[in-house]
């Protein structure tokens, strides 16, 4: 048994520093890490219903899956449980997305009912936290508790700040291919610098919006400045611990990964299907702490677990440190 310690080193210059904790996993991988070519089915139609959308794996490796048909959230405390440990019900109508915070609160898009609702773990009650005009196909809560909603039908991403003010942070509300526009945004991810990544479904690209910038940079897919990889209707975007992109490329029924050598297909690379080496219309993905990938496989009505091929493909445990200053903080891990 090993004790793993994360240490941040810095020189004090009348600035202050904050350790950031995440509710999700951002493992770090060695160059050209691989995942098993055959996945295993973690949850089937009995628990995820038809066409599962959102999934969230927290830092304790608890797994949260939305059933859009019943409006329920199924929770597995760990992958070894065959059946959900807990099921949460509420007045949810066709919910599409969810996000779980470090204290176990759950934000959920309430679909046809329109508001974003929050399930409070402490007293197991529901409250509405964000009024919206269109359902959220992606939800995210950043390290300052700001809430983001990607509106597929409104072609924009809204941000509700912790002071209850809501602003548009990406897109104009009118669909288009320009750098300040979106066409049917879906998955979103906000990094430690509060930079926003958007899976721009209709424009076949991943856009990066730097903090307080309304023009995005195409970092993958159609229109990227550097040759990256061709995407077709991307729906999911997550970052690993080295800020490398992992993309659910729904229209191509595959998952794309990246590292220092660029982009590559890591699963579902031979087309659509229902066998364990294929996906059909995948929607969202989430890492566990070991670097395994969980993905909602919509047309197959299942959630698949794609295991990292070798433990040695993972560098070391996550150590997330955030600085209020612009200075870089080196950090190390020791076994």
Where are these regions (language model features)?
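Short loop/turn segments that connect beta-strands within beta-propeller blades
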Residues: 77-81, 119-124, 160-164, 210-214, ...
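Beta-strand-rich domains and repeat architectures in extracellular enzymes and scaffolds
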Residues: 22, 42-71
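Blade/loop signatures of beta-propeller domains
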Residues: 13-38
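Beta-rich, blade/repeat-based domains predominating
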Residues: 48-60, 91-106, 132-147, 178-195, ...
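Blade-level signature of beta-propeller repeat domains, shared across WD40, Kelch, NHL, RCC1
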Residues: 280-335
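Residue position within the beta-strands of beta-propeller blades
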Residues: 64-67, 107-109, 148-150, 197-199, ...
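Short loop/turn segments immediately following the C-termini of beta-strands
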Residues: 60, 68, 111, 152, ...
């Amino acid at each position: 048994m090993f004790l793993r310690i994360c240490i941040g080193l810095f020189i004090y210059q009348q600035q202050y520093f904050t350790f950031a904790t995440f509710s999700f996993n951002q493992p770090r991988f060695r160059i050209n890490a691989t995942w098993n070519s055959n996945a295993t089915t973690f949850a089937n139609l009995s628990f995820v219903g038809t066409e599962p959308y959102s999934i969230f794996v927290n830092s304790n490796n608890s797994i949260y899956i939305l059933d859009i048909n019943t409006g329920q959230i199924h929770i597995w405390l760990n992958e070894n449980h065959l059946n959900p440990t807990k099921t949460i019900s509420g007045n949810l109508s066709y919910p599409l997305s969810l996000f779980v915070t470090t204290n176990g609160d759950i934000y959920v898009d309430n679909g046809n009912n329109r508001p974003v609702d929050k399930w409070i773990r402490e007293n197991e009650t529901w409250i509405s936290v964000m009024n919206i005009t269109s359902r959220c196909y992606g939800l995210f809560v950043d390290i300052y508790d700001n809430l983001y909603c990607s509106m597929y039908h409104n072609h924009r991403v809204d941000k509700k700040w912790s002071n209850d003010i809501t602003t548009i942070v990406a897109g104009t509300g009118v669909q288009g291919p320009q750098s300040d526009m979106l066409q049917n945004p879906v998955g979103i991810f906000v990094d430690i610098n509060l930079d926003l990544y958007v899976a721009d479904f209709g424009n076949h690209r991943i856009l990066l919006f730097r903090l307080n910038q309304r023009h995005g940079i195409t970092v993958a897919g159609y229109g990227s400045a550097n040759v990256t990889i061709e995407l077709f209707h991307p729906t999911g975007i997550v970052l690993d611990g080295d800020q490398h992109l992992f993309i659910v490329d729904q229209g191509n029924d595959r998952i794309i990964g990246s590292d220092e050598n660029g982009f590559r297909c890591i699963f579902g690379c031979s087309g659509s299907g229902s066998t364990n080496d294929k996906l059909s219309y995948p929607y969202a993905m989430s890492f566990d702490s070991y670097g395994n990938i969980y993905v909602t496989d919509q047309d197959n009505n299942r959630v698949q677990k794609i295991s990292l091929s070798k433990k040695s493909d993972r560098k070391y445990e996550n150590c997330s440190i955030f600085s209020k200053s612009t200075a870089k903080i080196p950090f190390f891990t020791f076994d």
